[in-house]
A protein has these predicted regions:
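Short linear sequence motif anchored by a di-proline
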Residues: 1-133
């Protein structure tokens, strides 16, 4: 998955899709939807393994337990499945802190002489898809 994504659905659409409700304090504090430009460090809806009927807002990016600086979370937004359970950055989260992260699109970039052009990619028959977090 790329570094930029989108989630243009309303809170109600997400609640219906996942049969869950937003954690009320998260919505009072911040109302992020819809968003055509989800980027690392942005607040984004997440459904955790521990609370599958509550949608929380968490900052996008992974901060390993051993990190001395939270800025490492800006860079840890992608993981390859091969070896994820062995890499120190992802191992503990992979085994103990699983979640799903909803999106409705992501961007791939084409380089041109004038600069980069974003292309938004969506699934043809699915309004909302999730990635593993």
């Amino acid at each position: 998955m790329c570094g930029r994504s989108s989630l243009t659905k309303t809170e109600k659409e997400l609640e219906q899709r996942f049969r869950a409700t937003f954690y009320s304090e998260d919505l009072e504090r911040y109302n992020p939807l819809p968003n055509y430009n989800v980027a690392p460090t942005h607040m984004h809806p997440v459904i955790t393994q521990d609370e599958p009927r509550i949608i929380h807002l968490y900052r996008w990016g992974l901060i390993p337990y051993w990190a001395k600086d939270i800025k490492i979370g800006y860079k840890l937004i992608n993981a390859r499945i091969e070896g994820i359970d062995e890499k120190p950055s992802f191992r503990q989260a992979f085994h103990k802190r699983r979640c799903i992260v909803p999106f409705d699109g992501y961007y791939e970039w084409q380089k041109t002489p004038e600069g980069k052009i974003p292309f938004r990619i969506q699934l043809k028959h699915v309004d909302i898809f999730t990635i593993a977090g």
